[in-house]
Amino acid sequence: MEEGIPFIRVADINEFGLNEPSIHLDNEIYRDVIRPTKNTILLTKDGSVGIGYYLTEDLNAITSGAILHLRMKNDAVLPQYLTLVLNSIVVKMQAERDAGGSIIQHWKPSEIEEVLIPILSNEQQRTICDLLEKSFKYKNLSINLLDCMKEAVEMVVEYNESVAIDFLKEATK
């Protein structure tokens, strides 16, 4: 089904973002199913365990049961910082230690609750989050510039160099 509500599986999530889901569910049947909301951390618990992604906006999608929706109960830890720590080698090693399953790994919620998280001061967390935000901004900018460059190369081949240069000047304002 090409139309409908996107269904996010573990394979569709990574620490840098969400890939476009290949599976969509019927709007009518799944109308009332809960959707992930802004400031939620998606955390994989089955298959590729321990991948976290922080949502900066509400998501009109349904997630697999293999993905937990984590919400912050207090302000002691910033969600962006927690997501970064969840994706760190420190937590990956804990996940590898805890996860069981001979074919598909399963990380139990009770084990996830016991994960040790290094907690920095709020100021240090904020500094890290600001750097992380800049990193994502520059990553997105580089992707956009790369797309512009690809299009400009096609314009050089199809038309001429001056058309491509004009396009790049306009696109990078």
Language model regions located:
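Short, charged beta-turn/beta-strand-edge "cap" motif at the junction between a beta-strand
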Residues: G47-I51
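Acidic, low-complexity, intrinsically disordered peripheral segments
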Residues: Y159-T172
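A generic structural signal for residues embedded in beta-strands
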Residues: L43-T44
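Short, well-ordered loop/turn elements at secondary-structure boundaries
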Residues: E2-E3, R35-N39, T63
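Low-complexity, Lys/Gly-biased intrinsically disordered segments
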Residues: M1-N14
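Basic, amphipathic alpha-helical recognition segments used for DNA target recognition
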Residues: E57-N60, L68-I119
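Amphipathic alpha-helical segments
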Residues: D75-T83, K92, E111-E154, E158
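Sequence-specific dsDNA recognition surfaces
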Residues: A11-K38
